[in-house]
A protein has these predicted regions:
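Alpha-helix capping/helix-boundary segments
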Residues: 6-7, 35, 70, 94-95, ...
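A general structural signal for well-ordered alpha-helical segments in protein cores
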Residues: 17, 36, 51-54, 71-74, ...
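Histidine- and aromatic-rich ligand-binding microenvironments
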Residues: 2-3, 32, 88-89, 111, ...
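Short, well-structured N-terminal submotif of metal-dependent ribonuclease cores
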Residues: 1-31, 41-56
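Short, hinge-like loop/turn segments at secondary-structure boundaries
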Residues: 47-50, 81-82, 124-127
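Generic structural signal for small/hydrophobic residues in well-ordered secondary structure
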Residues: 3-4, 39, 74, 99
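Active-site neighborhoods of divalent-metal-dependent phosphate/nucleic-acid chemistry enzymes
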Residues: 63-106, 110
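Acidic, PIN/NYN-like endoribonuclease modules and their adjacent C-terminal/linker elements
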Residues: 102-128
Length: 128
């Protein structure tokens, strides 16, 4: 899974993330509808080049959505984190739910919220 922060780095700082390309080639990549929302909510500030880049990227990889199964998994993550007294962005918990619902166990990200989530669910956060 490619998190929003990594997706943005692909466009803005490709040199920063190029060392992860072999992992992506080896294991594949997928995206989420949450990341699409996070990126395109700023569409009015984006150049045509950025819009085109991100549209092509989201067309090139599978995009998993926040369906009922993902909602259930996200709720479970949220409850487990609450019990530990941990707070994580609701959008990141939704991405975590999507991961679990689709059998995805790794995410490439700059966001340490996924490391926090890995305390309560079996996901690996690969921090850029």
């Amino acid at each position: 899974m490619l998190d929003t922060s990594f997706i943005i780095d692909l466009f803005k700082n490709p040199d920063r993330v190029k060392k992860y390309f072999s992992l992506i080639d080896k294991e594949g990549a997928c995206l989420t509808s949450i990341s699409y929302f996070e990126i395109f909510r700023a569409k009015r500030f984006m150049s045509k080049r950025e819009i085109s880049y991100f549209n092509q990227l989201f067309s090139a990889y599978p995009v998993y959505t926040f369906d009922l199964e993902a909602s259930e998994k996200a709720s479970e993550i949220w409850i487990k984190l609450e019990r530990l007294g941990e707070t994580v962005s609701v959008l990141d918990v939704m991405i975590g739910g999507i991961m679990l619902a689709n059998g995805v166990d790794k995410i490439i990200t700059r966001d340490r919220n996924f490391q926090t989530m890995s305390k309560v669910v079996d996901i690996e956060a690969i921090i850029v």
